[in-house]
Amino acid sequence: MASSNLLSLALFLVLLTHANSASQTSFSFQRFNETNLILQRDATVSSKGQLRLTNVNDNGEPTLSSLGRAFYSAPIQIWDNTTGAVAASPTSFTFNIDVPNNSGPADGLAFVLLPVGSQPKDKGGLLGLFNNYKYDSNAHTVAVEFDTLYNVHWDPKPRHIGIDVNSIKSIKTTTWDFVKGENAEVLITYDSSTKLLVASLVYPSLKTSFIVSDTVDLKSVLPEWVIVGFTATTGITKGNVETNDILSWSFASKLSDGTTSEALNLANFALNQIL
C-alpha cells in the first residue's frame, strides 16, 4: 500500500538521480504555514498545519459560496524560451473532503498551474478558475480537477477527475467514486518528452485507485513562468457544501532536454505500490 511519505520519497529520489537540468525547484510540506504560501480569498492554514481552502464556521462546518486558492510563494519556470526545454514536474499531495450528514458535496478542488499574478475567478462549479465554461486560449490554465458535483453545462454525470486546459470543460475525465472524510493521495506527473500528463488518486484505507491521462503541450498553453497550487469551492445552493483540506504537498520541477521519461516511470511506480 502506498503512503504519502512513500510517494514523496519516490518523487525526490527520482529527480535527484538525474542531474541534467538547468533549473530545478523542489519543496515538501508535511505541515503548512503561511510563510511559503500565497493565500487568496477564504484559504487559510489551520492550527493543525492543514491548508484549508474553503471556509468553515465556528462549529467546523463548511459554509456556502466559499472560494479559496493557495499557491507556492515563488514562481516556477515550466519551460525555457531560450532552449525550448520543458520541465518534468511531478507533484504529490494528500487531501480530505468531508461533507455534513445533511448535505451533498459541492463543488470540488483542483491542482493548478496558472499565470503569475492570477486572481480568483467565479465560484461554484467554475472552481475559482474561470468566469464561464467556454474555452479561452488567453486563460493559460492547466488543472487537474476533483469534481464532486455535476454541472449540466460542462460536466459528465458521474463525479470525476478531469484534466482541464483553458476551460472548466475537461479534455479528459475518469469516473471517481468519491468517499467523504477519507484521505485521498494524489500523484500527478508530466513527461516532457511525450507531453503526457498522468493523474492518479488512491484511497489507501479502501485500496481503490483512479487514473486519468492525456497529452498536453504545456509550452503552447502556459507562459514560461507560472504559479502552482490549489483552488477549491463550495456549493452556492443550500444542501451542497464540503470541506476542502490539503494535508501535505510535495512538488518538484526540473527542466528536461526531452530525452528522459522519469515522470511517467514515477507514475507507474506509484500505481504499482497500490494495485
Swiss-Prot record:
Single Gene Ontology MF annotation: toxin activity
BP terms from Gene Ontology: defense response
Function: This insecticidal carbohydrate-binding lectin is toxic for the cowpea weevil.
Matching SUPFAM superfamilies: Concanavalin A-like lectins/glucanases
Phylogenetic placement of the source organism: Eukaryota, Viridiplantae, Streptophyta, Embryophyta, Tracheophyta
Name of the protein described by the UniProt record: Erythroagglutinating phytohemagglutinin
Protein keywords: Glycoprotein, Lectin, Mannose-binding, Plant defense, Signal, Toxin
Misc: Antibiosis properties of legume lectins are proposed to be due to the lysis of epithelial cells of the intestine by binding to the carbohydrate moieties of these proteins.
